[in-house]
UniProtKB/Swiss-Prot annotation:
Involved in the synthesis of meso-diaminopimelate (m-DAP or DL-DAP), required for both lysine and peptidoglycan biosynthesis. Catalyzes the direct conversion of tetrahydrodipicolinate to LL-diaminopimelate. This is LL-diaminopimelate aminotransferase. It catalyses: (2S,6S)-2,6-diaminopimelate + 2-oxoglutarate = (S)-2,3,4,5-tetrahydrodipicolinate + L-glutamate + H2O + H(+). It comes from Methanosphaera stadtmanae (strain ATCC 43021 / DSM 3091 / JCM 11832 / MCB-3). Pathway: Amino-acid biosynthesis; L-lysine biosynthesis via DAP pathway; LL-2,6-diaminopimelate from (S)-tetrahydrodipicolinate (aminotransferase route): step 1/1. Signal peptide: none annotated. Keywords: Aminotransferase, Pyridoxal phosphate, Transferase. The keyword Transferase applies. The modification N6-(pyridoxal phosphate)lysine is found at K250. Its cofactor is pyridoxal 5'-phosphate. Pyridoxal 5'-phosphate binds at Y73, A109, K110, Y133, N188, Y219, S247, Y248, S249, R258, N293. One of its GO terms (molecular function) is L,L-diaminopimelate aminotransferase activity.
């Protein structure tokens, strides 16, 4: 066969991080079928969909079962009823004004952050914080922007911005000119946040260097500390240089239901090969119209329900449940004498392995000796080596049990 493969796929690490974790866990479970594993690795939720969400879902399905209210293909960008509620509830309280045409409903922030790079030329220089959510890097490797990976674990054409304990997990601005910057706050995996003053430095950099910020705000609903920005658009000038991604996965338990959105302000312009300004919003709209048929009507009605008074109350109860879990994890690990980060305005807890044990080795220790599944920090990039991530998304009972098991280990 003469068909040629996309050669850039050969540059990707063999297994996606969470696929490798699942492989190791499945292998161990088969060998030890009686082991009661507590999974605190992948960021999947355990609380069921809120009652108001389920009811809205059912009503929408019933509509599709009636000839008078049946709907076929929906708008690729999303139904106005959900877009308008997004603007009214998620942005207006922050003082951010948006148009319907600037909000795009999708089936996940992972899809959006992975797909958005398709709009840009292969020769753009991207920058990522390190450690980093793997999708940002892998999608650019697939597109041919990364170059080869060196022995140090870094791709040669990607600019890495270390976020470590030495800089309080606040990466420095790039020392060189970059074109596209991926930021995620509250951060995955470290669970840390930026102040408005710190985020403004990134917006200023983007203005000064004609750069674009791709801002992943999937975990903003966990922010409790006053003054921490929930959106990059709270920063003056950000609508000229940023795109924002959000998700209903964690805030409303939609990990299996699939619904999210991104905001592409009409003020954002990029340049073509001749240096002419090109508006970004229509490009994303064109991409979605070609490659995406939209989120189903029942799912969008279900998502809309979280903005009702009852829905907001139910969603907050679930968020509070996970926040309590995060507090249990953080306090328990600190009592063990471990260095712990995150878990305050985030569902993720990032902690230093004891005695400088490498990430995958400590992952195996927790798996085999405590029957707790974690995520090794090295899977998020070289600066993640020597750390592990735990999530607050299991049940409260399992969370307490997991901490008790870990506390009994001899490091």
């Amino acid at each position: 066969m003469a068909v040629k493969v996309n050669e850039y796929y050969s540059l990707i690490q063999n297994n996606y991080l969470f696929v490798e974790i699942a492989r190791r866990v499945d292998e161990y479970q088969k060998e030890n079928p009686d082991a009661n594993l507590i999974k605190m690795g992948i960021g999947d939720v355990t609380r069921p969909l809120a009652k108001s969400v389920v009811e809205a879902f059912k009503r929408a399905v019933d509509e599709l079962g009636d000839a008078d209210t049946f709907r076929g293909y929906g708008p690729e960008q999303g139904y106005d009823f959900l877009i308008e509620d997004v603007i009214e509830n998620d942005y207006k309280p922050l003082g951010v004004e948006l148009k319907n045409s600037e909000v795009f409903i999708s089936d996940g922030a992972k899809c959006d952050t992975g797909n958005f790079q398709e709009l840009f030329s292969k020769d753009n220089i991207i920058a990522v914080t390190d450690p980093v959510y793997p999708v940002y890097v892998d999608s650019n490797v697939m597109a041919g922007r990364s170059g080869k990976m060196g022995e140090d674990g870094f791709y040669e054409n990607i600019v890495y911005l270390p976020a470590t304990s030495e800089n309080d997990f606040v990466p420095s601005l790039p020392s060189e000119k970059v074109d596209i910057i991926y930021l995620c706050y509250p951060n995955n995996p470290t669970g840390t946040t930026l102040t408005k003053e710190q985020l403004k430095e990134w917006v200023d950099y983007a203005h000064e260097n004609d750069a674009l910020i791709l801002f992943d705000a999937a975990y903003e609903s966990f922010i409790k500390t006053p003054g921490i920005p929930h959106s990059i658009f709270e920063i003056e000038g950000a609508k000229d240089v940023a795109v924002e991604f959000r998700s209903y996965s964690k805030v409303a338990g939609f990990t299996g239901t699939r619904c999210a959105y991104c905001v592409v302000p009409e003020e954002v312009y990029v340049k073509d090969a001749n240096g002419n300004k090109v508006q970004l919003n229509p490009l994303w709209n064109r991409r979605q119209s070609t490659k995406f048929n939209g989120v189903s009507y029942p799912v969008q009605r279900a998502a809309q329900a979280i903005y009702t008074p009852e829905g907001k109350k139910e969603i907050q109860e679930n968020l509070d449940y996970y926040v309590k879990n995060a507090q249990v994890i953080r306090e328990s690990l600190e009592k063990m004498g471990l260095k712990v980060y995150g878990g305050v305005d985030s569902p993720y807890i990032w902690f230093k392995t004891p005695n400088d044990i490498d990430s995958w080795s400590f992952f195996d220790i927790l798996l085999k000796e405590a029957h707790v599944v974690s995520t090794p920090g090295a899977g998020f990039g070289p600066s993640g080596e020597g750390y592990l991530r735990l999530t607050a998304f299991n049940t409260y009972e399992n969370t307490v049990e997991a901490m008790d098991r870990i506390s009994k280990l001899e490091f």
